[in-house]
């Protein structure tokens, strides 16, 4: 996860504890020397607190880029400076990462209990399905220009019936409908933390629809074992 690295393009939001760009480049080189493929994960859509740190007066930075200014968490897709800002950062990320095969865009958990989404009138008018699709496709097209594929978390694109643990694509917004329109070479990283399930309908559905998929486990008892066994059968 690389959004907190001290990129030149994001100098306005650096944190004192962030990794230096030099250290990141050295880490990538170490990985390459040891036959490890680097897949940088740069948080987008939700989980964008990196974009809104507080200044010395305790005020949030970049509030024009926040969807909900009362709780800056997701970004405002209608702000014309958003994507140039992201693109400049990603250009740096992929160069420092040795021009990787994949870019992980995160893109999960856009709904936060403390933040409204969408909050801005112009984005409410667009509708969440269009916002989600257009944003994914911006990264898809960016990656294609740089001979990469994108990888993303899957929760917004599966229903609660498909994943009782984290499926956020059901009513009222029905975001799972968006996956019908998405290119089938987007790798879905199916994150599942619960150790109790032995069957994963979300993974079956995504695989049946043709998406490459990676099972992303956590550390709860039986989670790794159950998810691995299921994915091996797919």
Regions found by a protein language model. Name each.
Residues 1-186:
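Aromatic-lined carbohydrate-binding surfaces of glycoside hydrolases
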Residues 30, 205, 230:
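Hydrophobic/aromatic ligand-binding patch that stacks against planar heteroaromatic rings
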Residues 162, 170-227:
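Glycoside hydrolase catalytic-domain groove-lining segments
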Residues 232-234:
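Conserved short secondary-structure transition element at the edge of the structured enzyme core
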């Amino acid at each position: 996860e690389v959004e907190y690295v001290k990129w030149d393009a994001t100098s306005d939001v650096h944190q004192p504890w962030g990794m230096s760009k030099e250290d990141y480049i050295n880490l990538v080189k170490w990985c390459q020397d040891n036959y490890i493929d680097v897949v940088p994960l740069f948080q987008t859509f939700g989980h964008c607190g990196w974009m809104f740190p507080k200044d010395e007066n305790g005020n949030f930075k970049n509030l024009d880029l926040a969807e909900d200014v009362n709780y800056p968490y997701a970004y405002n897709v209608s702000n014309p400076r958003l994507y140039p800002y992201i693109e400049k950062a990603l250009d740096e990320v992929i160069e420092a990462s040795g021009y990787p095969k994949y870019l992980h865009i995160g893109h999960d958990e856009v709904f936060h209990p403390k933040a409204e989404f969408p909050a801005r009138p112009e984005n409410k008018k667009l509708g969440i399905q269009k916002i989600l699709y257009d944003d994914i496709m911006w990264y898809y097209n960016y990656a294609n220009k740089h001979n990469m594929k994108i990888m993303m978390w899957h929760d917004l694109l599966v229903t609660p019936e498909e994943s009782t643990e984290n499926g956020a694509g059901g009513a009222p917004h029905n975001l799972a409908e968006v996956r019908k329109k998405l290119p089938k070479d987007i790798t879905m990283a199916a994150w599942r933390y619960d150790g109790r399930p032995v069957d994963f309908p979300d993974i079956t559905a995504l695989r049946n629809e043709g998406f490459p998929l990676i099972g992303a486990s956590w550390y709860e008892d039986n989670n790794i074992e159950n998810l691995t066994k299921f994915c091996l059968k797919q």
